A protein has these predicted regions:
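Donor nucleotide-sugar binding/catalytic pocket of nucleotide-sugar-dependent glycosyltransferases
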Residues: 134, 138-178, 188-194, 245
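Conserved donor-binding/catalytic core segment of Leloir-type glycosyltransferases
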Residues: 181-202, 208-212, 222
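Nucleotide-activated donor-binding/catalytic signature segment of Leloir-type glycosyltransferases, i.e.
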Residues: 231-253
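Short alpha-helical donor nucleotide-sugar binding micro-motif in glycosyltransferases
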Residues: 249-250, 257-262
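Aromatic "clamp/platform" in nucleotide-sugar-dependent glycosyltransferases that forms part
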Residues: 270
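Short hydrophobic beta-strand element within catalytic cores of glycosyltransferases
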Residues: 287-290
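Conserved acidic donor-binding segment of nucleotide-sugar-dependent glycosyltransferases
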Residues: 302-303, 307-314, 323-329
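A short, well-ordered alpha-helix in the C-terminal region of glycosyltransferases
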Residues: 323, 330-345, 351-357
Length: 368
């Protein structure tokens, strides 16, 4: 099936790496593996992060124009007519101004992956975007949810409850390292995250606070990532001194190589939906210590693949890291379980099979 693919927050070919870009790329790979033909139909970014109503209005108008151009293209070249529209990551700051219009005009199914709705945004600075997302969800033939916490607010908007389709976050496990036994007296900790203000910086600050309580133990920390909050992140970890190695921004292959050399993934995950880096670490056979925020518990299973700590609790986070570092056998058990769980539940072929079932059930002519 020819599928029009669109990611309003960040297209899969965007030059700046991020979890959103990675997930968009993974969805493209999964759709191809399921036997379909996804085509990126637009790189238009509808994201507006400052609550600027005028800019949001301009983006909405631009989105309408692009949607009309896409429809004109379909009329001119009917051999490229899509049979289904698939949008990834739609929320109030990045509404989908293209998919509902094009899918509705063509009479094809409209599918959204990772849509989220926050009722409080209905009267906030992104109210127009919020209403657009609600409208898109009402039109959707299926909403694929990666985070179970989104379900409660989305279900009331769907035409039927069965249109919510749960899909576990996934990676291509074949690209990550094999399981290995922990080695050496000084465990190698690793954190992988962009350096942005807000939630990412909050996680780095909590990480610095937590690890500063463990200076009586031998360990090292690699930090993979970069961004506009780099100076603030360095200040957050300044008490760790020479124990930290700053790796900067790395490509996918280099990140996989660093994960393969580490012993423990540590990340507070403040206000994160689920965290792709945590899933990559688990695929690499790394146990994790993480904050129990958002959908992180769907990635790190407590006492099975790692430990979860109450959000924002630096002493508890430090205690959890200490306990895993000091117990080599426990760390090895977590590592094996982490890799196995990814292969069984979070691997690309598993996701491709599930997506294939959903799309095949919709068919090219089921849109209401």
């Amino acid at each position: 099936m020819r599928i029009a693919f669109y990611a309003p927050l960040k297209p899969p070919d965007h030059p700046v790496p991020s979890g959103d870009r990675q997930i968009a790329q993974l969805f493209l790979a999964a759709l191809r593996l399921a036997g379909h033909e996804p085509v990126l139909v637009s790189c238009f970014r509808s994201f507006e992060g400052y609550g600027d109503a005028l800019r949001q209005a301009r983006l909405a108008v631009l989105g309408e124009r692009i949607a009309n151009r896409l429809l004109s293209h379909c009329q001119e070249f009917p051999e490229f007519l899509p049979e289904l529209w698939f949008s990834y990551h739609v929320y109030h700051k990045a509404p989908d101004w293209l998919g509902p219009a094009v899918a509705g005009a063509l009479g094809i199914p409209y599918v959204v992956a990772e849509a989220s709705v926050t009722p409080m945004q209905g009267s906030g600075p992104w109210a127009d975007g919020h209403r657009a997302v609600e409208s898109a969800i009402r039109q959707a033939d299926a909403v694929i949810g990666l985070n179970s916490e989104d379900r409660e607010c989305i279900l009331p908007l769907l035409r039927e409850p069965w249109r919510w389709v749960a899909l576990k976050p996934f990676v291509d496990a074949a690209t990550y390292g094999r399981i290995r036994e922990p080695e050496g007296e000084a465990p190698r900790l690793i954190a992988v995250a962009m350096m942005r203000h807000g939630d990412k910086l909050a996680s780095y600050r909590l990480l610095g606070d937590s690890l500063s309580r463990l200076l009586d133990l031998p360990w090292s920390l690699e930090v993979v990532g970069d961004g506009p909050a780099r100076c603030d992140v360095e200040n957050a970890l300044v008490r760790l001194n020479e124990r930290v190695t700053w790796m900067g921004s790395l490509d996918h292959e280099a990140i996989a190589a660093r994960l393969a050399l580490a012993d423990l993934f540590v990340w507070p995950a403040c206000n994160e939906a689920f965290g792709m880096a945590l899933l990559e670490a688990q695929a690499s056979g790394l146990p994790g210590v993480a904050g129990a925020d958002g959908g992180v518990a769907e990635i790190v299973v407590p006492e099975v693949t790692g430990l979860l700590v109450a959000p924002g609790d630096a002493p508890a986070f430090a205690a959890a890291v200490r306990s895993v570092m000091l117990d080599h056998g426990r760390r090895a058990t977590f590592a094996k379980a982490a890799r196995q769980r990814v292969l069984l539940e979070h691997d690309l072929p598993v996701a491709a099979h599930r997506l294939g079932e959903v799309i095949d059930a919709l068919g090219p002519a089921c849109a209401a």
